[in-house]
Regions:
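Membrane translocator/pore-forming domains, dominated by Gram-negative outer-membrane beta-barrels
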Residues: 188, 224, 257-259, 269, ...
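Right-handed parallel beta-helix/beta-solenoid
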Residues: 54-59, 70-79, 91-103, 114-124, ...
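Beta-strand-rich solenoid/repeat architectures in extracellular/passenger domains
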Residues: 37, 43-49, 53-62, 66-68, ...
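Gram-negative bacterial Sec-dependent N-terminal signal peptides
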Residues: 1-34, 612
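Glycine- and acidic/polar-rich repeat regions and solenoidal domains
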Residues: 147-156, 209-210, 214-223, 227-231, ...
Length: 798
């Protein structure tokens, strides 16, 4: 929004030219030389004497680069360019205009006093300075005003003076004997219209702009601030003082700034106590500007209304105190910094009311609410019913539709009954409030629910919740009924878990499984042999975990690449020592069967390790130690991505013994029982989520075991290659706990302690020294646990 186009920046040149022509060629009045002009013309240039001037009866004074003392003009015209005007004598102002006087000034400095715009006078300032400093004042002086717009007792109405203040600095100090109504004011208006534009800056020791409704004021006083700044010292940026019924129209636009020394952007009160009968109206519009401060209406002493509108991406960070009506729309925002009250609140499409910043909890009280698609933003310490929260209290009716967004202010999440009350409606509850985004605390998901009493609550469970009259029959909305026989209590619905909790659990499970492998995974099925071996192995696994609390469905996909090589052999090749490295990754999905929301978990990392084994004829013993580091991520719908790191030590001890059980043709069959123990020591960073939830691992270390039986055949192909198919059954017993604590409330995945696997595959060893083996397997467990895996390995002996 603009008050004026660029063509208005210096409209004074054409009138000036016309005035000069009229004065020099058409007027029969002679040119005056100094002091007083009565229907005459004078020019002051650099080096001319510094004098006071008094103009009457359509006189014209031109000051070009010169300096004067106080100038007073009635029904006359002034043009100042690169000039200086000093307040002199006992005058209160540097320039005083009355009647139909006009002042046009460019790059001029006014010292010691301001400009007085009386009656129907007009002022246009471009790139000027009005400077009133303490050293410019006389002892006992009470009046220091940059620009004053008022009326003179001797003049007749109408009083419709105008001032356009363009790219000008106004700096005003307090008077030695200050008065709130007359000292340290950048602008004081009792009539007319003032436009403050194009980077103008007002720095006032008291109030930046004072609009004063007196018994002699005009019915409407208008103030426009466009791309400019008003800064006050001890008072409000803008003050409206009401002593008689008046309408005040104030617009702040295009990146303007208001800085109130007392914390008020706008203060509406009275100056002299009782106000004359009748209502005053203050219309305060903020357009495409961001302001910080309060809007305060002294409704106890002033009769009327304060109507506030935010539009075109405007924002106010502050309190609204006794505001009659507020309209927030067009991508505009009101960020409350404390409790506020508004008569009628209209929240338009794209508008936002943020009830707080999360550092404290605020209450907004309104008489009527109308929603047209805007958003209410609440900060809530998500927990049980008693949780602290921002709150909207509607004393009257609520109509329309509005969105609700909830930010968790450090709540750990908890089970709710009736819920956390966000919106209290005293009248007709006809409005629809819809939760946008997600409200999550700890491991729980919260939902916005309308209760039977018409109020709106956050609940961590689905369903309508318990009947409040059953919980507490003494509530005011409950109608007494005859007692009935007691019935068994109804279990409240369980709280709703958020899917991110499942993603954390899935990541923990995946990391625990990343490095696990057996002797046969490295060795294949070969017996001990001379020589050094290098080997490589890839595998992929898909796991489906049991639903967490019958709500979260978890699926985990893992893959890894392992590389290793022997670095030494002993005992005639029966024993060998080697090193190995692992690169692994996991991708998990957690989906809520209740809400439909989902989250993804990812784990990426690697490990280095050493191994050693000894094998002779039918027996083998194997041991390994690995250390891994992993990067973890969790991404929920509509939530910020969470990142954290983990470290893992894992050691394994394994042994097996082979029994020959016969032949099928030329293939020898053997049966090998195996036993393996795995110890895991995992350290996961304590992570604080963006919403404040503290997440830590609980019980991700411990001892696990495997007992297996392997049926293997050994034969040779026509080309002389050794072929060894196998079939294996394994029983896995997990001793390590699996759990994640969300703000100290532990949630566990449904990973069965006992799992059972069947696998099959084959190994082929060629005469050239190459060998390859691979296989696939399936695993089952309680609670619907399922897993499928496939692997392929290559080795070379030299």
């Amino acid at each position: 929004m603009r008050f004026h186009t660029n063509d208005d920046r210096l409209p004074l040149m054409r009138p000036l030219a016309r005035s000069l022509l009229a004065a020099l060629f058409l007027s029969p009045i002679s040119v005056a030389l100094a002091g007083e002009l009565d229907g005459g013309f004078a020019r002051v240039s650099s080096g001319d004497p510094v004098e006071e001037w008094r103009l009457i009866n359509e006189s014209f004074l031109q000051v070009l680069g010169g300096e004067t003392n106080t100038i007073s003009a009635t029904d006359s015209e002034l043009y100042l360019e690169y000039a200086s005007v000093n307040r002199s004598g006992h005058n209160q102002h540097a320039v005083a205009l009355a009647g139909d006087a006009r002042l046009q000034a460019l790059s001029t400095t006014f010292r010691g006093g301001g400009i007085h715009v009386n009656d129907r006078a007009y002022v246009h300032l471009v790139d000027n300075q009005i400077l009133i400093a303490p050293e410019d004042m006389r002892p006992g002086e009470r009046l220091t005003i940059g620009i004053e717009m008022s009326y003179s007792a001797a003049s007749a109405p109408p009083f419709n003076g105008k001032a356009r203040i363009d790219s000008t600095l106004i700096r005003v100090a307090d008077a030695p004997d200050p008065r709130d109504i007359s000292s340290g004011l950048g602008l004081r208006m009792t009539h007319g219209q003032a436009d403050i534009v194009n980077g103008t800056r007002i720095e006032a020791a008291n109030v930046g702009a004072l609009l004063w409704g007196t018994r002699h004021a005009t019915p409407v006083i208008q103030l426009g601030i466009d791309g400019s700044t008003i800064q006050s010292g001890r008072g409000a940026a803008i003050r409206v003082a009401v002593d008689a019924p008046t309408q005040f129209d104030i617009t702040v636009a295009n990146g303007s700034q208001l800085e109130g020394g007392d914390g008020n952007l706008l203060l509406v009160n009275t100056e002299n106590g009782p106000v004359l009968p009748g209502d005053s109206t203050v219309n305060f519009t903020v357009d495409d500007s961001r302001l910080a401060g309060n809007v305060t209406f002294d409704a106890a002493n002033v009769s009327g209304s304060v109507n506030l509108a935010l539009r075109n991406k405007a924002q106010i960070d502050g309190r609204f105190i006794n505001v009659t009506s507020a309209s927030i729309d067009s991508d505009s925002t009101w960020l409350m910094t404390g409790d506020s009250n508004v008569g009628a609140l209209t929240l338009g499409a794209g508008g936002t009311v943020a009830l707080g910043s999360g550092s404290s909890f605020n209450t907004l009280t309104v008489d009527e609410f109308t929603g047209n698609g805007g958003t209410l933003l609440f900060n809530t310490h998500l927990g049980d019913d008693s949780s602290a929260t921002d709150k909207l209290v509607i004393n009257g009716d609520a109509n329309g539709q509005a969105n609700v967004r909830v930010l968790n202010a450090g709540g750990a999440g908890a089970k709710t009954d009736r819920g956390i009350e966000l919106i209290d409606i005293g009248g007709a509850s006809n409005a629809q409030f819809d939760l946008v985004g997600r409200a999550v605390g700890g491991q729980y998901e919260y939902f916005l629910v309308k209760d039977a009493n018409g109020n709106w609550y956050l609940r961590s469970q689905t369903g309508a919740g318990p009947d409040p009259c059953v919980v507490d029959p003494t509530l005011p909305e409950c109608t007494p009924i005859d007692p009935v026989d007691p019935v068994d209590p109804i279990e409240p619905p369980p709280p709703i878990l958020r899917p991110e909790a499942g993603a954390y659990l899935a990541n923990q499970f995946a990391m625990d499984q990343m490095l696990r492998h057996t002797y046969r995974d490295r060795q294949g099925g070969a017996a001990a042999a001379d020589g050094i071996r290098g080997w490589a192995r890839v595998d992929a696994t898909q796991s489906k975990l049991g639903a967490v609390d019958d709500q979260l469905d978890l699926r985990v996909d893992r893959s890894r690449l392992q590389l290793g090589a022997d670095i030494g052999v002993f005992d005639d090749g029966r024993g060998r020592i080697g090193v190995m490295g692992t690169a692994a990754r996991s991708s998990a999905t957690s989906r809520s069967d209740v809400t439909g929301f989902s989250a993804r978990g990812k784990v990426e990392g690697g490990a280095l390790g050493v191994y050693g084994n000894w094998a002779k004829d039918a027996m083998y013993v194997d041991a390994s130690v690995q250390r891994g580091q992993f990067r973890n991520r969790v991404q929920g719908e509509g939530l910020a991505e969470e990142r954290y790191d983990s470290d893992l030590w894992q050691s394994s001890l394994e042994a097996g013994y082979r029994f020959g059980i016969g032949h099928i043709g030329t293939t020898a069959l053997s049966l090998r029982p195996e036993l393996q123990l795995v110890y895991t020591d995992a350290k996961t960073d304590v992570h604080t989520e963006t919403n404040g939830t503290v997440v830590r691992a609980a019980g991700d270390s411990g001892l696990s075991g495997r007992a297996g039986l392997r049926l293997q055949g050994e034969g040779h192909s026509a080309e002389g290659a050794s072929v060894s198919p196998y079939l294996a059954a394994n029983w896995y017993r997990d001793g390590a706990g699996n759990g994640i604590a969300f703000d100290d409330e532990v949630l566990k995945a449904r990973i069965p302690r006992n799992r059972y696997e069947l696998s099959a595959g084959a190994r082929v060893e060629f005469r050239s020294g190459f060998s390859a083996w691979g296989g696939f397997g399936v695993m089952r467990g309680d609670s619907g646990y399922r897993e499928a895996t496939a692997n392929l390995s290559l080795a070379y002996k030299w």
